[in-house]
């Protein structure tokens, strides 16, 4: 059984977590063996969405119904996600990379370091310019931070320059990117980070 690298994807409901996974997997699946675990509270909606996109065979995607606080399932009691990892590897023992998508949660959500090797936290511009200024452990502690849906900035009166400045205050030199995943704008920076900072470090 392989020992895959695991990347956690966290962020509020509707920020673009599932779409991010779809776009990234579509690019990387030609180069390596990938699996995905999604977390929803009472459904397996995100699993269905990814299956319907066809980015991966159905046996490489597992949906977890957390049945409660999504934060607990990725940190305090991640047993359901550990079980899902085992099931994925039983189905496909060649998997090299697993994405674990959390259920939509607040700015404080972080992944257990025992569950994932790296984490990405994503918000969207529509939540307001002030979000990066509020900080939050999800944004501060993540290895990579994404501000998605940049196309909405004019409609909600958000300054991307101000959001960038506020992000740098909390994250310092740690990487982040602006994206519009609908058009793939900014996606390349995310891919480059995964290929160079995650895969190269994780495989050494």
UniProtKB/Swiss-Prot annotation:
Pfam families for this protein: cobW
Top-level taxon in the UniProt lineage: Bacteria
GO MF terms, alphabetically ordered: GTP binding; GTPase activity; nickel cation binding
Localization terms from the record: Cytoplasm
Binding site for GTP: 11-18
GO terms classed as biological process: urea catabolic process
SUPFAM superfamilies listed in its UniProt record: P-loop containing nucleoside triphosphate hydrolases
GO cellular component annotations of the record: cytoplasm
Keyword annotations of the record: Chaperone, Cytoplasm, GTP-binding, Nickel insertion, Nucleotide-binding
Database matches in InterPro entries: CobW/HypB/UreG_nucleotide-bd (IPR003495), P-loop_NTPase (IPR027417), UreG (IPR004400)
Function of the molecule: Facilitates the functional incorporation of the urease nickel metallocenter. This process requires GTP hydrolysis, probably effectuated by UreG.
Similarity comment: Belongs to the SIMIBI class G3E GTPase family. UreG subfamily.
Subunit record text: Homodimer. UreD, UreF and UreG form a complex that acts as a GTP-hydrolysis-dependent molecular chaperone, activating the urease apoprotein by helping to assemble the nickel containing metallocenter of UreC. The UreE protein probably delivers the nickel.
Protein's recorded name: Urease accessory protein UreG
Annotated source species: Staphylococcus epidermidis (strain ATCC 35984 / DSM 28319 / BCRC 17069 / CCUG 31568 / BM 3577 / RP62A)
């Amino acid at each position: 059984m392989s020992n895959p690298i695991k990347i956690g994807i966290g962020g509020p409901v509707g920020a673009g977590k599932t779409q991010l996974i779809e776009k990234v997997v579509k690019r990387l699946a030609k180069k390596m063996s990938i699996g995905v675990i999604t977390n929803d509270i009472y459904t397996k909606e995100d699993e269905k969405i990814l299956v319907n996109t066809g980015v991966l065979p159905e046996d490489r995607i597992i949906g977890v119904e957390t049945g409660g606080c999504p934060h607990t399932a990725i940190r305090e009691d991640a047993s359901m996600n550990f079980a899902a990892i085992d099931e994925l590897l039983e189905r496909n023992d060649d998997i090299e990379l697993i994405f674990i998508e959390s259920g939509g949660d607040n700015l404080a959500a972080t992944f257990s370091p025992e569950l994932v090797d790296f984490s990405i936290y994503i918000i969207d511009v529509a939540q307001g310019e002030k979000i990066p200024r509020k900080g939050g452990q999800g944004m501060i502690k993540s290895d990579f931070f994404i501000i998605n849906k940049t196309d909405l900035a004019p409609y909600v009166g958000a300054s991307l320059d101000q959001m960038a400045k506020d992000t740098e205050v909390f994250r310092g030199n740690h990487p982040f990117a602006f994206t519009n995943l609908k058009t793939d704008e900014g996606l390349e920076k995310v891919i480059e980070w995964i290929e160079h900072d995650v895969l190269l470090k994780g495989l050494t």
